[in-house]
Amino acid sequence: VLSAVLLATTGWSWYLGQVAEATVDRTDAIPGSGNEDSGGAAEAMNLLLVGSDSRADLTEEQLAELYAGTDSGLNTDTMILVHVPADGSAASFVSFPRDSYVQIPGHGEDKLNAAYAYGYAAVDSSLPETERQAGGAQLLVQTIHDLTGLQIDHYAEVDLLGFFELTSVVGGVEVNLCAAVDDREYSGAYFPAGPQTIAGADALKFVRQRHHYDNGLGDFNRIIRQQVFIAGVLRNMLSTDVLLDPGKQRELVEAAARSLTVDQDLDLFSLAAQMQSVTLDGITFQTVPMADPYAEDEQGRSIVRLEDEDTLHQFFAQLSAEPEAPEAPAAPPAPVDPSTVSVEVLNGSGISGLAASAQGELEAAGFTVTGTGNAD
């Protein structure tokens, strides 16, 4: 999505599109079944944007710098559905809490961020890693499809290293913290209060932090921070500093493409063309409707209970509804037949002969002149 925004705003987008296509990784993320057409406009697009906690490409030094630990990294801690209408006039981002308690096809109820891990584990371990990753992506796509009632057209995933590299190239995002943050025990976030620019490793800590000043709202505060940060990245990409700098454009496209793994059929150039009318005012951020954000499952784990299926499907149907076409302008009134109009010409100018001259022109145009004279 970020690379597409940049491609859509440049005069040499075809070239940048080729650069992105040559760099981006592909995965077979869209399942052949369990993701049926939801009947929306054919040209509209639903893209599942995923942030995984994969640490596969991180060195020990990077693990330490990013406070990433050494977990296996099969969870998807950030899941955002991006809807772009057929006319490309807007983009809606809907976040899903990672602890959303949902039906995962073939596995019953569990936290949403476990869907990828289930799909990954279901693929024979003797097969290539790329096939196991595709299995994880496909089950997550099926789960989101069932939740929303929408067909998921495309998939884009960024891991910890990719996010770190992208935010480093973007140059960071300006934030204004109401209070100092000290979450060094968990995410590593350690920021003073007040305005500051956050990039690279600090950016990753900022969007992953959920233990400090959360008042029990850790994951929801994290979602807000993620949405704020994405909006800031988009603002930077649409700034004149980028739009007027071809070198910066290429650098950002290369970083975005290196950071992403996308489905086999996502055409970045077509996506850019579809989003070329999107402005910051046309971008909205929401969170999926929740019934109980502080629930527990039978094992005593903290979970988020979402609204029922009908409510969720109605919410996403409204979200994906195409904007109504503006009403056609009223037809102009029928022209008046000049022969039906009677005119009396009175000369008030004081110049002799003007009334007679006007009479001749009006009669030539088809009007009926009932008389001429001088005005009082």
What are these regions (language model features)?
Residues 1-376:
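Non-catalytic, solvent-exposed segments at the cell envelope interface
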